Amino acid sequence: MKKAVIVENKGCATCSIGAACLVDGPIPDFEIAGATGLFGLWG
């Protein structure tokens, strides 16, 4: 379900949001979901 939220933000927005979450890491679950979402888009 978290993947869907990330997929809604397409293009560079997804990269920016994913990178920001990975760098800041405010919420571990979202951080993992961000990485999974980015790999899902590219993979």
From Swiss-Prot:
Asked if Secreted is a keyword of the record, the answer is yes
- Report where the covalent cross-link Cyclopeptide (Asn-Gly) sits: N9-G43
Propeptide boundaries = 1-8
In the induction comment, the record states:
Transcription is highly induced by oxygen limitation and is under dual and independent control of Spo0A-AbrB and ResDE.
Q: Which domain of life is it from?
A: Bacteria
Substituting F39Y results in: In vivo forms 3 thioether cross-links, forms the cyclopeptide
Q: Which UniProt keywords apply?
A: Antibiotic, Antimicrobial, Bacteriocin, D-amino acid, Secreted, Thioether bond
Q: Where is this cross-link: 2-cysteinyl-D-phenylalanine (Cys-Phe)?
A: C12-F39
Alphabetical list of Pfam families matching this protein: Subtilosin_A
Q: How is it modified after translation?
A: This sactipeptide undergoes unique processing steps that include proteolytic cleavage after Glu-8, and covalent linkage of the alpha-amino of Asn-9 with the carboxyl of Gly-43 to form a cyclopeptide. Thioether cross-links are formed between cysteines and the alpha-carbons of other amino acids, Cys-12 to Phe-39, Cys-15 to Thr-36, and Cys-21 to Phe-30. In forming these cross-links, Thr-36 and Phe-39 are converted to D-amino acids. Propeptide cleavage and cyclopeptide formation only occur after all 3 thioether cross-links are formed.
Where is it located? Secreted
Q: Which family does it belong to?
A: Belongs to the bacteriocin class V family.
* Name of this protein: Subtilosin-A
Organism in which the protein naturally occurs: Bacillus subtilis (strain 168)
Q: Give the gene that encodes this protein.
A: sboA
